[in-house]
Amino acid sequence: MYKHILVAVDLSEESPILLKKAVGIAKRHDAKLSIIHVDVNFSDLYTGLIDVNMSSMQDRISTETQKALLDLAESVDYPISEKLSGSGDLGQVLSDAIEQYDVDLLVTGHHQDFWSKLMSSTRQVMNTIKIDMLVVPLRDE
């Protein structure tokens, strides 16, 4: 029996699919439900000179992410306990959230396209996370 379900979303058009699937599970188990989005920290990826104010860009992205998470949470008929946003290594951020919020099921999506076969973030997460995972296949049309 699950007590707290965490849905990892990328805030794409597939995010509601994942959340609705998790809502069904949460209702059956009377579990808490939370969502998380992990942003890539752009300043960590580029080491050369750039001609933009990185902190103002990250602030804008963070504000947009929070609004998107709120909109997503309001799109379902189930209370969302936590709306989390993090940046950095996907596996580490998810591990930290799982530990901090006592999560026992992680729901994530997996694109079934050429690039995902080569570089899957889901595979990295599966090797990091120590709780049950539901990996929902997302087909690219």
From Swiss-Prot:
Gene3D superfamilies: HUPs. Keywords: Cytoplasm. Its main location: cytoplasm. Required for resistance to DNA-damaging agents. Homodimer. Belongs to the universal stress protein A family. This is Universal stress protein A homolog.
